[in-house]
Each structure stands twice: as structure tokens, then as C-alpha cells.
Amino acid sequence: MPLARRTWLFVPGADVAAHRAAARSGADVIVLELEDFTPPELRAKARALSALAFALWRKSGAIAAVRINPLEADGIDDLAGIEPPDVLMMSKVATPEQVQRLEAAAPPGAELVPNIESAAGLLRTAEIAHASKRISALLVASEDMVADLGTERSRDGVELAYVRARFLVECRAAGVEAIDCPYTFSDVKGAIADARYAKRLGYRMKSLVDPSHAKPINAVFTPGPRELAHARKIVAAFERARAAGRDRAKVDGALIEVPIYAAAKRLLASRA
């Protein structure tokens, strides 16, 4: 999975002003949203705009993605009418068979990112992740998932705590990246807090629906000077301990063993 993918910004498919704002947002991936953000009567227009939108986003340094409707809905028309994207997402995936049909219909070369939006889909995350070798990541939804669970969306996200934790574990075990659900409120402070929570769970990527959230969320998922300095401290202390014949080290009162050392090395390598 080349290039940074920290932020995945969903944009209304038929809104040219939103396409331009997305290009200025700093998001790593920009998603032309043909499902919930685009009413059926505007989908033909949105598909026709895909070539210009993708060119604009690629010029800005972003990855051009699209989210289509399920194939049993308007998905086939979406695929027929859009410019080939870098990444192809599909909404409401709950079975591996849906992924297999998507792969058969998808333009060659596009990565696949199924979206998990229901309890049934969550319980089959591993099967879905293994349904195609073209899958590079999976995304877990917020609004549709909350509706399926019969609860309400809140700023603290407690209603999705189990979903987000389980989804991350399932994706990690399957060997694909996990994209966290969006924070669907406008306040930047809340978006930052939600991104920090996701990072603590183990996420490296997050979806979003507000372009003003892109740069703050990128900052959360980008190691800062203090984090890098701490990682260097861990690596140095552990390597000194190993050279002295010890199997662990201590840094700031915390025991450092192989997994923590390896994580610090990965962090430093990611910024090399």
C-alpha cells in the first residue's frame, strides 16, 4: 500500500465546490461518494464529474478513490460511468460473495476497499478480507452501523467502542489495513479526540466527512518530535541491554521487551 493513507475524506459526488475544497484539505485519500452523499437523481452527474475530480485530486497529491453503491443497487451503473480510480470502495458489504462479484466487475488495477456497515458484516470481517487479493484495506462505518445496532451516534462514540476494537483486531489478523469510522460532528476538538482514541486502539487510518478535519487528523497519525525521541530512547536502551546480555530494558519506569522494541523500530523506519 504505497503513499500515506492517514485520512480518507468522503466528498459528495455531484458537488464541484466540495471537490475543490477536498483538493485543498490535505487529505491523503479523497473519495467520490456515490452512495449516501449523492441522491439517485444526481448520480449520473457525479459519475460524469469523476474524471475531472480524480485529475484535480491527483494533482494535489491525493489518492483518487470512489465509493460505489452495492452492485445489486446502482453499483453496476456507477462502474460503467466513472473514470477508473486508484481505489474502489463499495458500501454495505456483508459477505465475501459481494467482494468476489465486485472484483469481477472492477476496473483492472484499482485496489478494493470493502465497507463494513452492519453487525452481519462485522462478524464476517475476516472472510471478507480474504475474499480478494486486491483488497488493501477495509473500512468500518459509523452511521449505518449505529442504525443497524439500534442505538444513537454520540460524540464520545461509546456505542461503537466494541465495533471499532473488534474490527481492528479482525483486520490486523487478516493482514489488511483497518480504516476507522468517521467522526460525524463538525467540531475539530472532538475530531482530534476521536482520532487519538482510534490511534490508541491501533488504527493508522481514519475516514472523515469534513475537510477541515483532515490536517488535524493527519497530525494525530504523524509521529511528532517527542514520539520519535521516545522511540529512539527505547531502541537505544534495549540494544544496550541486549549487548550486556539482558533480555529487557527499562525506560522511564516501563519494561521494554522485544514487541515494544520492534514497534519503536517500525515507527522510526516509517519516518526515515
Predicted regions and their residues:
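Expand to "…catalyze enediolate/carbanion chemistry for C-C bond making/breaking, isomerization
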Residues: 1-272
